[in-house]
Design a protein with these regions (language model features):
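Bacterial Sec-dependent N-terminal signal peptides
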Residues: 1-22, 381, 449, 460
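Alpha-helix initiation and N-capping motif
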Residues: 3, 354-355, 394
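Residue-level signal for beta-strand positions within conserved beta-sheet cores that form or flank
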Residues: 16, 41, 338-340, 365, ...
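Short small/polar-residue motifs
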Residues: 18, 27-29, 55, 324, ...
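Negatively charged
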Residues: 21-378
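C-terminal outer-membrane/trafficking sorting elements
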Residues: 384-460
């Protein structure tokens, strides 16, 4: 009798276990999930989770996920792996149940032409989505709705949509709060332009090339919390449409910014308040970013050692370039001096009031600076006159007269040569002052009085 009771209990328990291991529909009304903890044998299950009638599903785990890749590349593989016995039609991709999969590295990478609906997949246990849709062939056709995916356990999305040139679906509701790596996530995803401004990226440390060559992307991500990001190498490189305000970003932990805005030809937003004090590399940061023209003289660049090509082919306004030179040359008591022997490219930018600051950086720190040179061409070679003072005679032979108002008495002046060197300086002691310029060589010079623009005069 006891044996019979035990057998009955065993049969009931087995039946309950089998019944509990089935395919169900998630509360979101889209995702299909496997309630079991192991893959059944065989791994085909019949269920009615969608309420539309009985369907066949294939349950996969990490050991069989490669079959999905083969299926995506070649329909014949689908016949081999995803066709039930005595049938000829493989199970559709939307009926592959991925609840037991935790790693989806490169799942569709080799399948450049894949474009099947997989929005019902359960990815809630996946932690790695590296190169998920990435394709080196740049022929990715995938553009299906995957907005309902639960990616809350994913930590690595690097290269997920790399060169997924067709993808442009709404994924704004994704919970990416556990992601730490987004490097190259949308790099080369030339169609993508969805609003992902609400994403919580506070744990991300690597955003290298995240939107590089994402030529359509132009969404407001200025509210992103990037305070833990260390790597912004190539962040918007060649993101030719992007021009959104990101001046409020906390970039205080970033150490690399090379190529960040390289060829981002639309970008021209104020970022002068950024704390870049930990950045070491700014090479090509704004190279060919031809629209950019903002003051960044307040940046603390004392840790930067590489600035080659920083503004290559870019021309800041003279005012903004002067601001840069003057700001960077001015070291506050609590600031670290500039790194020595840095090679800096100011592109085609020209300086005027920043001449002495430029000369100071070169002489004090051994920097090599290339730019558009000294240019105060808005000033003519006749008598220079403003509301405050005038110069005469111009050209001058031995003396240069300055007539000014009381506001300029005891103010310092500098005379700068065409190479940006201060060759003479002093103070204006009277309303009408005379400067002896007899010892100066013939050429064009610039007189700068404190608080005023430089004024050009010719020494004959």
């Amino acid at each position: 009798m006891k044996r019979i009771l035990l057998l009955i209990i065993l049969l009931i328990t087995t039946a309950q276990t089998i019944h509990s291991q089935t395919v169900v529909l998630d509360a979101n009304g889209v995702t299909v999930k496997w309630t079991g903890t192991t893959v059944p044998t065989p791994y085909f299950v019949q269920a009615n989770p969608r309420g539309t009638g009985m369907e066949w599903f294939a349950i996969v785990d990490n050991s069989t996920k490669s079959n999905i890749t083969d299926y995506a590349r070649n329909i014949q593989s689908g016949i081999i792996y995803f066709t039930r016995p005595s049938t000829t039609t493989p199970i559709p991709f939307n009926n592959i149940v991925t609840t037991l999969v935790t790693n989806m590295i490169g799942l569709f990478g080799p399948a450049g032409t894949f474009n099947q609906p997989i929005g019902s997949w359960d990815v809630s246990n996946v932690t790695i989505m590296v190169n998920f849709f990435s394709t080196s062939s740049n022929t990715s056709n995938f553009n299906q709705n995957i907005g309902s995916w639960n990616v809350s356990n994913v930590t690595d999305m690097s290269g997920m949509f790399y060169q997924a040139i067709s993808f442009n679906q709404n994924i704004s509701s994704w919970n990416v709060s556990n992601v730490t790596n987004m490097s190259s996530m949308f790099s080369g995803a030339t169609a993508f332009n969805q609003n992902i401004s609400s994403w919580n990226v506070s744990r991300v440390t690597d955003m290298t090339n995240v939107f590089a060559y994402a030529t359509a992307f132009n969404q407001p991500i200025g509210s992103w919390n990037v305070s833990n990001v260390k790597f912004m190498w190539g962040f918007f490189c060649n993101a030719t449409a992007f021009n959104q305000p990101i001046g409020a970003w906390n970039v205080s932990n970033v150490i690399t910014m090379p190529f960040m805005f390289r060829e981002a030809t639309s970008f021209n937003q104020p970022i002068g308040s950024w704390n870049v004090s930990n950045v070491k590399n700014m090479s090509d940061m704004f190279a060919n970013a031809t629209a950019f023209n903002q003051p960044i003289g307040a940046w603390n660049v004392s840790n930067v050692t590489i600035m080659t090509g920083m503004f290559s082919s870019v021309q800041l306004s003279t005012a903004n370039y002067d601001d840069l030179l003057i700001g960077w040359s001015t070291i506050s008591p609590n600031e670290t001096p500039l790194k020595p022997n840095v090679t800096f490219s100011g592109g085609n930018s020209k300086y005027c009031n920043g001449a002495s600051a430029r000369a100071s950086i070169i002489s004090n720190y051994g920097w090599t600076i290339t730019d558009g040179g000294l240019d105060c061409s808005s000033l003519d070679t006749e008598t220079f006159e403003t509301n405050s003072f005038k110069l005469y005679p111009n050209p001058a032979v031995s003396v240069l007269n300055i007539k000014t108002d009381n506001n300029f008495i005891n103010q310092p002046y500098s005379i700068i040569d065409g190479l940006g060197r201060v060759v003479l300086n002093g103070k204006l002691n009277e309303v009408e002052s005379t400067i002896n310029v007899e010892q100066l060589s013939k050429g064009i010079y610039y007189l700068k009085v404190s608080g005023n623009s430089a004024s050009k005069f010719i020494k004959e």
